[in-house]
């Protein structure tokens, strides 16, 4: 079971690409809050290492057991930063948090790197990685009502752009 508290979060990382023949546990990413900033470590699962994959997915992650820590000059491993949203996606997530806070009559909380990573709607996520907060839990983010990015908004944008094209 994943541990999640005010000080640490354990994220189950799954690889999901055709060559694997299905979703495969790759390992666990741990985010620990240290002096107001998250420090990340990653440990490959025993199964992933036993598969004998020679694929180096991040130059800062070597294929061996045990925790490996992200470099101080990086907010996370590049592999996971690639799965996180860009600047605009982060703005959308901050707006979603503000809306949620208003609905729950509380102050918006400051989002951390792990919140951005886990906040991308699973079905819209780019790349071959998927994430859970427990081994038997759902892939996240799975909130259909507040998906980031909101696909309905993209359709509205498409319609507006088509109207502009037709005016010419």
PLM regions: where:
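Phosphate/dinucleotide-binding and metal-coordinating scaffold of catalytic cores
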Residues: 1-168
């Amino acid at each position: 079971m994943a541990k999640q508290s005010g000080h640490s979060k354990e994220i189950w990382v799954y690889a999901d690409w055709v060559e694997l023949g299905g979703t495969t546990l790759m390992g666990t990413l741990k985010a620990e809050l240290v002096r107001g900033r998250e420090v990340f470590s990653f440990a490959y699962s025993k199964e992933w290492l036993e598969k004998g994959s020679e694929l180096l997915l991040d130059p800062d992650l070597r294929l061996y057991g045990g925790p490996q820590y992200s470099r101080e000059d990086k907010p996370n491993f590049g592999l996971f930063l690639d799965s996180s949203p860009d600047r605009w996606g982060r703005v959308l997530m901050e707006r979603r948090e503000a809306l949620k806070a208003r609905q729950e009559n509380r102050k918006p909380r400051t989002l951390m790197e792990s919140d951005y990573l886990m906040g991308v709607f699973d079905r819209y996520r780019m790349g071959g990685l998927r994430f859970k907060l427990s081994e038997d839990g759902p892939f996240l983010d799975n909130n259909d009502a507040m998906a980031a990015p909101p696909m309905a908004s993209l359709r509205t944008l498409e319609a507006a752009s088509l109207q502009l094209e037709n005016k010419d």
